């Protein structure tokens, strides 16, 4: 029943999102005339080679209108982003509910494990669709934006992806990509599923063994302080795997769509580090251990 309710709400939100997109285009078309007037006024001023009181007053009015138009369009876009975030949240809730209930399509019976190629594609899609933090002027990026860690009392929710420190079969410890199943306030411990085993491998871990992954990408152009910087030690997901390893930041992203360039610790190389490899913001978290000398 809850799944049906979620489906109907998602349909409503998609309709509302479509209307907001139409409003955005209408707002942009409406403001176009004013922008053309600004350009033409500047061209006349250049032709006459002077700034008369008339042009000064006219431009002040045109720019005031342009600013108001831009703010109106911005408000519509923010509403659209809120709708998208709500849709994604409902889809995630629906996925978790189906997983708990053990629901599967008749045409697709349960599989013990997901094909590795499919899993890698899903991880790439998750990184690409991670929302970009877009704050208002003066806003600071929140916790879990880029390199900014979660607050001390933060508890990851069921379905959230985390880096989890677990014991491997050989007894060694490693950081894996995992999904939160539950959290017990009585024991202060998480239950997490290894993402690579489709729930087959479940671990019970203390809070210090779980690092929540970023929930927003940081924009290098507006919030560079929310990114890890060159030579900073991190844990990064090694490409085409589901394990995190220690690495140094070689270069932070330069544009919102860019990845980090990182150097993984690797004793097979003379300097102890691999050549630069790209890792998405989604899969780079702080490493609290000291650098190797």
Swiss-Prot record:
UniProt-annotated stretches for the region Histone H3K4me3 binding: 264-266
Residues flagged as site, Histone H3K4me3 binding: 238, 245
Effect seen on changing residue 232 to A: Does not strongly affect binding to H3K4me
InterPro entries associated with the record: SGF29, SGF29_tudor-like_dom, Tudor_SGF29_rpt1, Tudor_SGF29_rpt2
Keywords: Acetylation, Chromatin regulator, Coiled coil, Nucleus, Transcription, Transcription regulation
Residues in SGF29 C-terminal domain copies: 152-293
Domain of life: Eukaryota
Entry keyword Nucleus: yes
Coiled coil regions, renumbered to chain: 3-88
Pfam families with a match to the protein in the record: SGF29_Tudor
Subcellular location field: Nucleus
Record CDD domains: Tudor_SGF29_rpt1, Tudor_SGF29_rpt2
Annotated effect of mutating residue 245 to F: Reduced H3K4me3 binding
Sites bearing N6-acetyllysine, chain numbering: 288
Impact when changing residue 242 to A: Almost abolished H3K4me3 binding
GO molecular function, one term: histone H3K36me3 reader activity
Protein family membership: Belongs to the SGF29 family.
Protein name, per record: SAGA-associated factor 29
Organism of derivation: Homo sapiens
Lineage start: Eukaryota, Metazoa, Chordata, Craniata, Vertebrata
